[in-house]
Amino acid sequence: CLDWLTPFSLFTGVSVVVLYATLGCGWLIFKTEKALQNKMFEFMPKLIITLFVIFGCVSIYTPLVHHQIAERWFSQPQIFYFSPVPVLVLLFTFLALKACKQRKEFLPFIYTLALVILAYTGFLISLWPYVIPPSVTIWEAAAPASSQLFALIGALILIPIILIYTGLSYWVFRDKVRI
């Protein structure tokens, strides 16, 4: 009944909280000033280092437990294709810490977004093409073509509306928040 409740699942749950806290802290650095911004500049390096340690723990633990992922990451020629992901994680972690030290207002958020994209990229290339490793591929799990067409039509209608609304809200709230 509680097979899903493992130390690793709890760890990844905490990881998601730290990830979103880091994104939120970067956003607050960008959108606030004075006392709150100073507090976030103090807090952000701690979050970035914690996030980097979490990424490292997941990156070490996962290949040890899942041999298919270890084989995928560390065999040739894949190692040459996949190695930019951890290198870029290290680079963007360093850049985010440097941006905090130099008190750059927008860059910590951008670098954290890059870390999020790299985390999902690492996850995707580790599992591709399986959605339920190691047995069900993305094509076997896909919905029928008629359902996909219905979803596509809905997306074509709703995504522009969402983008317009989001753009408008960013335009309305484009200035810094003054407290």
What are these regions (language model features)?
Residues 23, 127, 169:
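Divalent metal-coordination and catalytic microenvironments
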Residues 109-117:
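Central hydrophobic cores of alpha-helical transmembrane segments
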Residues 138-140, 144, 156, 165-179:
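Extramembrane terminal tails and long inter-domain/linker segments of multi-pass membrane proteins
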Residues 16-19, 118-123, 159-162:
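Alpha-helical transmembrane segments of multi-pass membrane proteins
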Residues 54-64, 118-135:
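Hydrophobic alpha-helical transmembrane segments in multi-pass integral membrane proteins
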Residues 5, 9, 146-157:
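Individual transmembrane alpha-helices with interfacial aromatic-anchor signatures
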Residues 1-104, 108:
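Long, contiguous internal "core" modules enriched in hydrophobic/ aromatic residues
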Residues 132-151:
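Short, membrane-exposed interhelical loops at transmembrane-helix boundaries
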